[in-house]
């Protein structure tokens, strides 16, 4: 099943450990869409941030902002409406991390650059918002074993997840499909994955897809 012609640009989002990249890869492979991924390993300031959240926050955040802006430039090269795209990040969510980690002075500097870069970024046609309990996210982070994520704790994830929930609770730029990854296993239960594809064919407003609703 390919993506709907009405969805040339699909985004998978959610807090750290939710499974964004895994789902984005699968959707791209199964639908023939082109893939646009975050590359945290290419941000040279990220390990420093996890070691020193205060001193390393601004360089890491600006590194991600510029990286994402560079990736979005792909859309300005004429291919956005010629091909389907699946991305594992939403440009606008970059500010969630900035609000969480930056001092007021650094946030003001960040906002100046963010506004310059964000004004012509295209909105997605639909967003899959992955969410789940903090315990589930921490287990997934530990399982993938990235050294620079070893210091992520429950308090940080709770704050980040709350910011995601508020952000998507009022997000109106595109339809949002929320998937609770603790209730819906899109890998072990292929029938639920097919239901997600069907939901993408008729996206509308804000939809919550949980196991009881999908079966």
Residue ranges: model-predicted function:
Residues 20:
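Conserved lysine of the Walker
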Residues 142-151, 155-215:
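NTP-dependent small-molecule kinase module
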Residues 15:
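P-loop (Walker A) phosphate-binding loop of NTP-binding proteins
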Residues 94-165:
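A glycine- and Lys/Arg-enriched "phosphate-lid" helix/loop adjacent to the NTP-binding pocket
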Residues 29-67:
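Conserved substrate/cofactor phosphate-moiety recognition/catalytic segment
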Residues 56-122:
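Glycine-rich phosphate-binding loop used to anchor ATP phosphates in small-molecule kinases
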Residues 23-24:
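Post-Walker A alpha-helix
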Residues 12:
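Hydrophobic anchor at the beta1->P-loop junction of P-loop NTPases
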């Amino acid at each position: 099943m390919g993506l709907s012609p009405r969805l040339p640009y699909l985004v998978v989002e959610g807090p750290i450990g939710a499974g964004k990249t895994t789902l984005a890869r699968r959707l791209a492979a199964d639908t023939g869409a082109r893939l646009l991924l975050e590359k945290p390993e290419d941000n040279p300031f990220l390990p420093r941030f996890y070691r020193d959240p205060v001193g390393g926050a601004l360089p890491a955040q600006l590194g991600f902002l510029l990286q994402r802006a560079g990736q979005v430039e792909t859309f300005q090269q004429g291919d956005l409406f010629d091909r389907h795209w699946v991305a594992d990040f939403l440009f606008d969510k970059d500010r969630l991390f900035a609000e969480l980690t930056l001092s007021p002075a650094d946030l003001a500097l960040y906002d100046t650059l963010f506004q310059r870069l964000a004004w012509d970024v295209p909105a997605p046609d639909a967003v899959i918002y992955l969410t789940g309990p903090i315990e589930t996210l921490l287990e997934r982070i530990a399982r993938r074993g990235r050294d620079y994520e070893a210091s992520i704790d429950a308090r940080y994830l709770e704050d980040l997840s709350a910011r995601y929930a508020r952000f998507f609770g009022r997000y109106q730029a595109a339809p949002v499909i929320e998937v609770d990854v603790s209730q819906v296993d899109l890998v072990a239960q292929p029938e639920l994955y097919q239901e997600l594809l069907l939901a993408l064919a008729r996206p509308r407003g804000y939809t919550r897809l949980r196991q009881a609703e999908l079966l």
